[in-house]
């Protein structure tokens, strides 16, 4: 093995000092919660991200796979060993990698990403797979990471070139006595032909063994792997399967995957790509992958679908969760994290869910599906693996839990999704990883998130819900990667992000400070260690097994009560009794502590503890501001641990704080009020005498509630107050006073206590400032002895008032509150109290008086001042003295001489009247408003100064006059006097138009929605006037949006969007909207015409914490087009917001200094949005000062040609809706120069001129070169164009000429039919050359007689219908009786019954009838009958037709079939055929078409006949690009034109000799020493290689041993064409179902690959240089058409012959008519009248069972050789034939397979032929059984002795031997069999045949 090119270095003891954080906390001072916990972390090399993590369960060591390195770490994350894995020179396109053979791709230093890391415990090694060299793996020793092996030289060693660390998963399956297996599942990154997506490999004991990673099983057809077929990529170009997790359980290995799928959203016909999460299951022992099943998984909560798998982990259920789910504690559960939706794989949405799956339920679902599939229900449902739907086949099997599949019905997909149980959802911080375990029967999950947090979740939380009990930030920046692992003891958890590995304790109980917090946290690890007063695990609490020392439930927490629980601050050394609950025994003693006041010993008596309160010097002074009490914690401290273990609140109260009686006695403590001393005390004995003590609130001195106390200003008046318990002042105490606080000024008034319940403030007058307040509430306090307050609990106030304030008119005065006793004093004309109105001079009006009407009403304003004559206008009249009651004005209002009826609702006494106008006469035009108040006397009448006018309203026009049906159009109606009146109603037909505003010349209203498209008459009603005018508004269909472009913007919006739609011009102010995170942004649009508008994209509302470089999709995106609801949210758009461009500031100072003319560069990122479609630009404007500059944009910078400015200017960049100034630019002017500077510049200038001249000369030369290059490119383009045109022209010309040539060529050749025996053998036993039924029975002589006797007896039994039917049915019911066996038995029975065809037909009919019954019983679709050969009857039917249609073939159908075969062969051979891939220039099959231009010439060689040297030379047409073998075959075809194939010499046995003029002879060969080898490709020799000219003479001679140019013999044999065909057919992929790409496998010894005309394109070896000779390969598909046209006549002839009832005088074979009648009979019997079903039965029975076989395999009928290209073309014809017999419609599109498209136009007419054929047969007279039997007897007689019946019987008997008991069983039980003693006879046969008899 050649030395590896890596420079491996093993860095031992490479210790990194990491942030050391202790995980065990000291019990005394747990850290404060505010501190961020510090964890042990490890950070690798800055440039290398971490990928994978695995912990050795035995040693606890950690293995960390990173980019370019593998680390081995100790459990506290110290580096023990590192092993370097990269970088190295590589190119992902090098396959095989450059370490195996040289690679022509450019190499670059490439990182090695760790894709898989597994511990192989059995062999003590680490398997580490990387991304370099197509994904090779290393095996490293666990101890020191020493490299044990690194297999890289075989295909199997390349796992996949994919570069992502998270897309590969491996599972090791271990065996005790032989080598382990490794199941590997990987994404393939678009290279499915190189890498299987899932496979099982050998893990050999020896790490350097050759078989390491070899497939567990591999032969020509089957292997332990599955590849993604290349066809899948045509449907989904970026298809891949991403593997998220894998594990083994029971007999199975499981993988969880994410894969793209095309689905149609509900209600849509177009398909869109989504991602589906699936579980894949395989049997551990399955080598052929028949057990592959895949099931979609997902979960849903509250209507939200979570379908994108993020991570998963397998764990056990645990007892608590098990009970909830109904499973056993040790059943497997799968914990999974999904994110919302199905749309995006990489940028998942943040909403995510934790779901659990019960593995057993998934397995049960798979078992159900397997059972239904083996009943024949449904299809295999695996879109990516089977491009078309393959139906399930039924088979009688019992499928148990461990069923591992057969080669049928596999691989299988389950279409129905298995839904997980959602236990927890998170909407903001996406969950990205999960790990779980069971702790003390509780099931716990630990989930990592996008932001680097760890969520701890108790899945079996209280009430059956999951409980998230803790969240910790564990890595600095997220996301947390999928791989998480527990330490060996499960006490620590290792968590990593791309840059950091952290060790986190599984629990952090120490953070909880109290028993309640600890046990309320929900963490099942935590309990309360009582005497140590800490929260901890039970095992860490001392003596936790003793009673009451460890609390694990809330009710076990310690409780403490104290009696008494409060004392006054002035009480000392009081005895306190403490009662304790849940306390352990306290024999060691206990202390009582009053916080930091005092500490003393407690006396323990049972569960009571006695303590004393603190002494005088220790009691706190309770400060007044803090209220009347002070709470301290009374704590109990254990003397054993020195820790406080219980505490309760204890109160010191202070009564003296209270200074009012009510607050004192209402205090919760024992406070008393001393009434005469006015103090509060805890000791009632200190009150001066007994009556003075107050304990109850009702005994307190206090004022009682009174109604409003009204005091007019400036009036002298006493205030009397009610009270109770007023104390009598004692000697030496002062009397009572009232204190009023008026506008901040205290006014004290002496007061008089009448008795204990009454007090009066003395006569005084009061006043306050200003006339803005007409009454003022004033605080009132009653005191005695100067400052002893009397409590005022009702908070009585005194109201001071002024009558004149804010009541300027008589009406307003009389409206005032009657309690004020205000009235109107007329002579000064003001509002006063009565005593202030001079009585002799004037009248005083008051409301209650008889004369209470105000005179002189006045009108100040009327609204509106115009109205229609018709009336109905509501006129509002405002003024003074307009009556005090409604009845005063109810009938006395006239407006412009017209009655106006007042309305109660609008009346405000004295101030406002609203009345409704009556109709005016035509003569009335204008007038004043006149009113009378109550009576119409002059002093009670008023007239307005404004005039009211009657108007005539007219309408002129409306704009716009059409709008959408949904409404919302703002319509302007123009006219005159449109502001008259009070109320406007606009109607469009019956739809209201909502009034908006108006002026004299217009009314604006908004339309409402209409149900239909209509023209509506416009009516406007103003009050009672209907304005008539023929205006029409047209409701038009709502606008629609057809498409928008581009479908993206940036987050700040304001980029232009072009919108196309219909009826867009209806909308006046269209707007575009986007809603995100519940916030909506709107922007404007401008309509260009009915179908186009341009909009400015709305911004996207993003929160401040949004990550700026993510792509976003708005929740809603749409348009606000008036009221059109349907466009508010566009469903079919995928509008995307890319991150805003971000600019950097010029420098920290923000100033950039430049020379004039230097461009300004603005650096940034996201300057070009990463749109999928390619070149998109944003429109940038950059202003320097005021001047714009021209901008060039790249992704990370803007280049701005600085304008012609000097000095300092601000730079401003604008794009979309954002502006940014990176700073100022300072452009320095050029400075004047000194003399030396000028001299030196002159010198430099001279040199520069010389230099420039030199440059110009060089430039001239260079530009000439580039001109040439341009011309060359131009020529190449022209060349390509002309070649495409030529190709099309050529194809057309060929089509016209070839048809004629072919038809003339084919005449006259005899048809080499096979004889009857060979023909039947090839159909009955395909592929078996010398079958026993053709030979005599071979038995040893001594047994011959017995055996013959036994077989004769057996023949009698076979001829017994009851026995034969029973025999066949029994065999068919055996599970091990395979499809091949069924076919074999059917053929053997038919050979035995060849001489008794009547009986055979009878049995066949019986079996078919049974089959039809069974088919209909099992509810299969009736059309499936006879579709596939799954029973003996179906194969017998084929054989029956084979026997009976031989004559028809020979006389009739054989000729067109042979002609078609010859035509195809000739047509193919007219053009080049690749000897290795089998592709040809002319083909009907797209797969076998050479898609390149191959230059070739036709040569005519003269060939000497090998048989007769003297016969004339035969001219043979060949091509100069033919290989030598191809030439030999063409020569043989020409010379032995009429000789059957089997009688001709083989090309491989002949040599081709070129006889040159000089008599020299040269042997030509496919490979010899002259063969050209180039870059590992060896090209087969062609005629052109030897430069054989046209007209040369060649001869075929028998093979020579050597020749001068021969190559060693081992390779000579390789040159036969069939060998290459085999090579193509079977290499590269184990089974044509799984991948259809041939792969030319290089010889592993030499690494050389053969080619002929085209290199196999999978190898990508065509270099860039070959581009010139390539053309778009699809151009060549026109050749299919040319070939089809050429062969059309022959296809038509064949189909016409087969589908006509009378052809060239040959009648329809009786067998066909007889069988079709039988099928019709059966259909009638079962009541099937669907013509499609009958048609299908007939098609399945004859065309599909017989004719298709003959068309595809003409070698069954003729003695010919069929090569692979002819085979491919015949397959296309056969497919067309099948399509013609089908009744279903084929929908074709541009993606349909080419063979369907090729004959799409012809198939309908062929279908008509088939229908006509079937109906003609139906109309023919029925064949009587007599006639039929006579015909069958004749057939039997003709072919009586073709087969050896004895040998056939012996073959059949072998099945009796195999299933003797099963066959005898039914014979014993059946009555008929019993009567005929069939069981006994069979036993006789068995006895005779047995060996030992």
UniProtKB/Swiss-Prot annotation:
The glycosylation sites annotated in the UniProt record are: 654, 1006, 1131, 1179
Where does the record place the modification N6-acetyllysine? 1349
Q: What is the name listed in the Swiss-Prot or TrEMBL entry for this protein?
A: Plexin-A4
> In the record, what lineage is assigned to the organism producing the protein?
Eukaryota, Metazoa, Chordata, Craniata, Vertebrata
**Domain named PSI: which ranges?**
508-558, 654-701, 802-855
List the stretches on the Cytoplasmic face of the membrane: 1258-1893
Q: Which organism is it from?
A: Mus musculus
Q: Which GO terms describe its cellular component?
A: cerebellar climbing fiber to Purkinje cell synapse; plasma membrane
Which InterPro entries does this UniProt record tie to the protein?
Answer: Ig-like_fold (IPR013783), Ig_E-set (IPR014756), IPT_dom (IPR002909), Plexin (IPR031148), Plexin_cytoplasmic_RasGAP_dom (IPR013548), Plexin_RBD (IPR046800), Plexin_repeat (IPR002165), PSI (IPR016201)
Please give the chief subcellular localization of this protein.
membrane
């Amino acid at each position: 093995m050649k030395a590896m090119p890596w420079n491996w270095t093993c860095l031992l003891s490479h210790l990194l000092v990491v942030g050391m954080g202790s995980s065990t906390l000291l019990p005394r001072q747990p850290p404060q919660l505010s501190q961020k916990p510090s964890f042990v972390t490890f950070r690798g090399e800055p440039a290398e991200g971490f990928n994978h993590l695995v912990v050795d369960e035995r040693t606890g060591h950690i293995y960390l796979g990173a980019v370019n390195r593998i680390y081995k770490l100790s459990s506290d994350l110290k580096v023990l060993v590192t092993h370097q894995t990269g970088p190295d020179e590589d190119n992902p396109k090098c396959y095989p990698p450059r370490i195996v053979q040289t690679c022509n791709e450019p190499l670059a230093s490439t990182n090695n990403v760790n894709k898989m890391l597994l511990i192989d415990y059995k062999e003590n090694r680490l398997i580490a797979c990387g991304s370099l060299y197509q994904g090779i793996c290393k095996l490293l020793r666990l101890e020191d990471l020493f490299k044990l092996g690194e297999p890289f030289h075989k295909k199997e060693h390349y796992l996949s070139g994919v570069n992502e660390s998270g897309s590969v998963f491996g599972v090791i399956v271990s065996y005790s006595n032989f080598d382990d297996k490794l199941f590997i599942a990987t994404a393939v990154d678009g290279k499915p032909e190189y890498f299987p997506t899932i496979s099982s490999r050998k893990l050999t004991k020896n790490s350097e063994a050759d078989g390491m990673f070899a497939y567990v099983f591999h032969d020509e057809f089957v292997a332990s792997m599955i590849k993604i077929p290349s066809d899948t990529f045509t449907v989904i170009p970026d298809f891949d399967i991403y593997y998220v997790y894998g594990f083994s359980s029971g007999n199975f290995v499981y993988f969880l995957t994410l894969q793209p799928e095309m689905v149609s959203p509900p209600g849509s016909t177009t398909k869109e790509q989504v991602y589906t999460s699936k579980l894949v299951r395989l049997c551990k022992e399955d080598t052929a992958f028949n057990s592959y099943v895949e099931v979609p998984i997902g979960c849903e909560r509250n209507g939200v679908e979570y379908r994108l798998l993020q991570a998963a982990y397998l764990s056990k259920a645990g007892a608590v969760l098990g009970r909830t789910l109904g499973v056993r504690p040790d059943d497997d559960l799968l914990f999974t994290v999904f994110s919302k939706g199905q749309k995006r794989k990489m940028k998942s949405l943040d909403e995510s869910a934790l779901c659990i799956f019960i593995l057993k339920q998934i397995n049960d679902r798979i078992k159900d599906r397997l059972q239904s599939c083996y009943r024949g229900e449904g299809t295999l449902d695996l879109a990516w693996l089977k491009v078309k739907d393959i139906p399930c086949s039924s088979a009688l099997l019992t499928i148990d839990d461990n069923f591992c599949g057969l080669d049928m019905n596999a691989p299988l997909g389950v279409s129905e999704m298995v839904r997980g149980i959602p236990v927890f959802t998170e909407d903001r911080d996406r969950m990205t990883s999960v790990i779980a375990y069971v702790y003390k029967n509780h099931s716990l999950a630990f989930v990592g998130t996008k932001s680097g947090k760890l969520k701890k979740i108790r899945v079996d939380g209280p009430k059956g819900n999951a409980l998230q009990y803790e969240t910790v930030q564990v890595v600095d920046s997220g996301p947390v990667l999928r791989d998480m692992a527990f330490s060996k003891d499960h006490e620590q958890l290792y968590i990593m992000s791309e840059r950091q590995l952290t060790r986190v304790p599984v629990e952090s109980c120490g953070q909880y400070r109290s028993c309640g917090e600890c046990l309320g946290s929900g963490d099942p690890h935590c309990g309360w260690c009582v005497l140590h007063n800490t929260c901890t695990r039970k095992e860490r609490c001392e003596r936790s097994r003793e009673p009451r020392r460890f609390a694990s439930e809330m009710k076990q927490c310690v409780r403490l009560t104290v009696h008494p629980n409060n004392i006054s601050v002035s009480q000392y050394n009081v005895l306190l009794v403490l009662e304790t609950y849940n306390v352990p025994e306290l024999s060691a003693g206990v202390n009582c502590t009053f916080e930091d006041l005092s500490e003393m010993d407690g006396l323990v008596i049972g569960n009571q503890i006695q303590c004393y309160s603190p002494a005088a010097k220790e009691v706190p002074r309770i400060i007044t501001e803090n209220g009347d009490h002070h709470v301290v914690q009374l704590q109990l401290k254990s003397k054993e641990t020195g820790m406080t273990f219980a505490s309760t609140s204890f109160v010191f109260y202070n009564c003296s704080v209270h200074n009012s009686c009510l607050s004192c006695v209402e205090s919760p403590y024992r406070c008393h009020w001393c009434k005469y001393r006015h103090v509060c005390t805890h000791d009632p004995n200190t009150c001066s005498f007994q009556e003075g003590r107050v304990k109850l609130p009702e005994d307190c001195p206090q004022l009682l509630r009174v109604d409003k106390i009204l005091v007019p200003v400036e009036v002298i008046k006493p205030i009397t107050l009610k009270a109770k318990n007023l104390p009598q002042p004692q000697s030496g105490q002062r009397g009572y006073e009232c204190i009023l606080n008026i506008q901040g000024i205290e006014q004290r008034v002496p007061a008089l206590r009448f008795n204990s319940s009454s007090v009066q403030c003395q006569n005084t007058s009061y006043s306050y400032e200003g006339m803005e307040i007409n009454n003022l509430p004033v605080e009132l306090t009653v005191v005695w002895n100067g400052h002893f307050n009397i409590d005022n609990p009702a908070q009585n106030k005194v109201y001071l008032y002024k009558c004149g304030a804010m009541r300027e008119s008589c009406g307003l005065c009389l409206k005032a509150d009657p309690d004020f006793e205000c009235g109107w004093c007329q002579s000064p004309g003001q509002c006063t109290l009565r005593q202030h109105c001079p009585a002799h001079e004037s009248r005083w009006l008051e409301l209650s008086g008889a004369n209470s009407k105000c005179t002189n009403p006045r009108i100040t304003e009327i609204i509106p001042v115009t109205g229609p004559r018709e009336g109905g206008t509501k006129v509002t009249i405002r003024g003074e003295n307009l009556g005090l009651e409604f009845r005063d004005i109810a009938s006395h209002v006239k407006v412009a001489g017209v009655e106006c009826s007042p309305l109660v609702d609008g009346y405000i006494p004295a101030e406002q009247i609203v009345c409704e106008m009556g109709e005016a006469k035509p003569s009335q035009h204008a007038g004043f408003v006149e009113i009378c108040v109550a009576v119409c006397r002059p002093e009670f009448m008023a007239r307005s100064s404004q005039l009211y006018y009657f108007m005539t309203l007219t309408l002129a026009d409306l704009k716009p006059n059409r709008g959408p049906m949904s409404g919302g159009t703002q319509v302007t109606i123009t006219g005159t006097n449109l502001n008259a009146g009070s109320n406007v109603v606009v109607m469009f037909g019956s739809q209201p138009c909502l009034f908006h505003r108006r002026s004299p010349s217009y009314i604006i209203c908004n339309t409402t929605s209409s149900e239909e498209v209509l023209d509506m008459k416009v009516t406007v009603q103003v009050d009672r006037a209907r304005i008539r005018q023929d205006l029409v508004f047209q409701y038009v269909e709502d606008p629609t949006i057809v498409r928008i472009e581009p479908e993206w913007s940036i987050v700040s919006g304001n980029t232009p969007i072009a919108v196309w739609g219909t009826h867009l011009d209806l909308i006046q102010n269209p707007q575009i909207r986007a809603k995100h995170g519940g916030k909506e942004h709107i922007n404007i649009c401008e309509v260009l015409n009915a179908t186009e508008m341009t909009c400015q994209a709305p911004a996207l509302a993003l929160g401040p914490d949004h990550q700026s470089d993510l792509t976003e999709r708005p929740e809603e995106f749409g348009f606000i087009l008036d009221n059109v609801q349907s466009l508010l949210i566009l469903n079919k758009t995928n509008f995307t917001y890319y991150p805003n461009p971000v600019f950097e500031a010029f420098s920290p100072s923000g100033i950039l200094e430049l020379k004039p003319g230097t461009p300004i560069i603005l650096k940034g990122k996201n300057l070009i949005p990463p749109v999928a479609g390619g070149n998109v630009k944003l429109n940038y404007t950059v202003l320097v000062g005021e001047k714009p500059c021209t901008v060039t944009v790249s992704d990370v910078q803007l280049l701005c040609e600085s304008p012609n400015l000097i000095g300092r200017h601000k730079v401003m960049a604008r794009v979309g809706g954002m502006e940014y100034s990176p700073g100022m630019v300072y452009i320095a002017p050029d400075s004047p120069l000194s003399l030396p500077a000028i001299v030196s510049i002159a010198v430099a200038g001279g040199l520069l001129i010389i230099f420039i001249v030199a440059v110009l000369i060089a430039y001239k030369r260079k530009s000439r070169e580039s001109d040439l290059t341009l011309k060359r490119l131009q020529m190449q383009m022209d060349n390509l164009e002309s070649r495409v045109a030529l190709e099309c022209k050529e194809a057309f010309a060929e089509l016209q000429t070839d048809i004629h040539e072919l038809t003339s060529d084919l005449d006259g050749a005899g048809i080499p039919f096979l004889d009857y025996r060979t023909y039947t053998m090839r159909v009955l036993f395909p592929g078996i050359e010398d079958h026993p039924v053709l030979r005599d029975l071979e038995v040893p002589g001594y047994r011959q007689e017995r055996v013959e006797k036994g077989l004769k007896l057996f023949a009698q039994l076979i001829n017994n219908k009851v026995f034969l039917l029973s025999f066949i049915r029994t065999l068919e019911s055996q599970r091990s009786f395979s499809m091949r066996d069924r076919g074999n038995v059917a053929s053997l029975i038919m050979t035995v019954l060849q001489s008794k065809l009547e009986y055979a037909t009878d049995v066949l009919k019986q079996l078919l009838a049974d089959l039809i019954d069974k088919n209909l019983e099992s509810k299969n679709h009736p059309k499936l009958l006879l579709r596939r050969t799954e029973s003996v009857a179906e194969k017998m039917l084929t054989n029956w037709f084979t026997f009976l249609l031989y004559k028809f073939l020979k006389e009739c159908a054989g000729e067109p079939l042979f002609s078609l075969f010859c035509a195809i062969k000739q047509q193919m051979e007219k053009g080049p055929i690749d000897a290795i891939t089998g592709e040809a220039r002319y083909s009907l099959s797209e797969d076998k078409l050479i898609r390149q231009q191959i230059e070739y010439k036709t040569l005519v060689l003269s060939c000497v006949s090998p048989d007769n040297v003297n016969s004339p030379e035969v001219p043979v047409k060949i091509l100069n690009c033919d290989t030598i073998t191809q030439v030999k075959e063409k020569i043989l075809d020409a010379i032995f034109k009429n000789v059957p194939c089997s009688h001709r010499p083989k090309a491989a046995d002949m040599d081709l000799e070129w006889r040159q003029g000089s008599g020299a002879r040269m042997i030509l060969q496919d490979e010899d020493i002259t063969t050209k080898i180039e870059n590992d490709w060896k090209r087969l020799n062609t005629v052109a290689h030897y430069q054989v000219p046209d007209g040369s003479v060649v001869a075929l001679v028998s093979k020579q041993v050597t020749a001068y140019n021969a190559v060693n013999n081992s390779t000579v044999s390789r040159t036969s064409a069939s060998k290459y065909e085999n090579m193509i057919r079977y290499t590269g992929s184990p089974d044509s179902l799984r991948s259809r790409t041939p792969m030319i496998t290089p010889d592993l010894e030499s690494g050389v690959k053969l080619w002929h005309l085209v290199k196999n394109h999978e190898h990508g070896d065509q270099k860039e240089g070959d581009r010139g000779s390539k053309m778009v390969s699809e151009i060549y598909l026109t050749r299919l058409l040319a070939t089809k046209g050429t062969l059309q006549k022959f296809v038509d002839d064949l189909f016409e012959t087969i589908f006509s009832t009378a052809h060239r005088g040959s009648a329809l074979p009786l067998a066909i008519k007889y069988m079709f009648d039988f099928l019709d009979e059966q259909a009638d019997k079962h009541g099937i009248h669907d013509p499609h079903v009958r048609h299908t039965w007939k098609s399945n029975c004859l065309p599909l069972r017989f004719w298709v076989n003959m068309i595809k395999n003409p070698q069954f009928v003729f003695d010919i050789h069929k090569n692979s290209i002819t085979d491919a073309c015949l397959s296309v014809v056969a497919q067309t034939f099948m399509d013609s017999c089908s009744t279903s419609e084929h929908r074709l599109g541009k993606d349909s397979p080419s063979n369907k498209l090729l004959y799409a136009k012809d198939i309908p007419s062929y279908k008509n032929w088939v229908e006509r054929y079937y109906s003609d047969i139906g109309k023919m007279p029925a064949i009587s059984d007599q006639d039929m039997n006579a015909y069958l007897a004749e057939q039997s007689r003709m072919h009586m002795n073709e087969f050896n019946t004895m040998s056939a019987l012996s073959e059949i008997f072998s099945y009796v031997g195999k299933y003797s008991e099963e066959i005898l069983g039914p014979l014993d039980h059946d009555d008929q069999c019993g009567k005929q003693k069939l069981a006994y006879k069979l036993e006789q046969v068995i006895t005779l045949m047995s060996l030992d008899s």
